[in-house]
């Protein structure tokens, strides 16, 4: 267990309390989106009536590094309640997390959306909760296939090229909650213009919402990112653009 603690700003507290079928967490780098998002995702899994769930990242190695084994990741947060089987088991060959929830064991499959043959083989049936890491980089066919099979969808992203299909088909159909609308950059609000889907929520998070980010770390991130570049616009300002 790491010495770090999950520190929650008022906006993240509101996020944890929010009950929505689909939630998109867009914003700057180091905003805490993955850290707090994963904690909520696991609570949603525990509440779900379904046994099978999915976590998707570019590949299983990325999922292990950024989601499962990171400080304040799934293993750190839930300890003995989770068992990660990175190579599957003799009964279930797909990499998965076994989550000993109060209502019974849950199986969370860990999938890489970067390998189409693999995810096509693994994806089938219906699932409770779906978490997609960096959905802006995901294969849109995976997003379409997986999203239609789940009861609850959470996805994280740093802003990217607004012409990506995932924006038009998914993210731009969500809206910020009225009480947090003013914290969403005007540029992004103007992009959220597709027909809204009932209950779909868009969350914008920035450095200011990550109470666990030390000032020295933030200063280093800012110093090491060249101004005027795409990466500065997307990851530091939290704005979309090529």
Task: Enumerate the predicted regions with their spans.
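Phosphate/NTP-binding elements of NTP-utilizing enzymes
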Residues: 1-242
């Amino acid at each position: 267990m790491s010495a770090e603690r999950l520190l929650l700003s008022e906006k993240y507290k509101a996020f944890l309390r929010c009950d929505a079928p689909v939630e998109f967490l867009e914003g700057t780098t180091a905003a805490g989106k993955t850290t707090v998002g994963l904690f909520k995702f696991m609570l949603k899994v525990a509440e779900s009536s379904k046994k099978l769930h999915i976590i998707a990242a570019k590949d299983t190695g990325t999922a292990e590094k950024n989601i499962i084994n990171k400080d304040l990741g799934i293993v750190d947060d839930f300890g003995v309640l989770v068992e990660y089987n990175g190579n599957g088991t003799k009964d279930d060959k797909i990499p998965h997390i076994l989550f000993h929830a109060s209502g019974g064991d849950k199986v969370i499959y860990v999938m890489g959306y970067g390998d189409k043959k693999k995810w096509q083989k693994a994806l089938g049936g219906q699932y409770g909760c779906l978490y997609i890491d960096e959905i802006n980089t995901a294969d849109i066919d995976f997003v379409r296939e997986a999203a239609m099979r789940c009861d609850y969808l959470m996805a994280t992203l740093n802003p990217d090229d607004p012409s990506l299909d995932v924006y038009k088909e998914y993210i731009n159909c969500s809206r910020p909650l009225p009480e947090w609308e003013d914290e969403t950059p005007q540029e992004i609000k103007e992009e959220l213009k597709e027909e809204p889907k009932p209950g779909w929520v868009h969350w914008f998070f920035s450095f200011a919402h990550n109470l666990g980010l030390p000032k020295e770390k933030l200063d280093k991130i800012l110093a090491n990112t060249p101004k005027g570049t795409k990466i500065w616009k997307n990851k530091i300002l939290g704005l979309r653009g090529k």
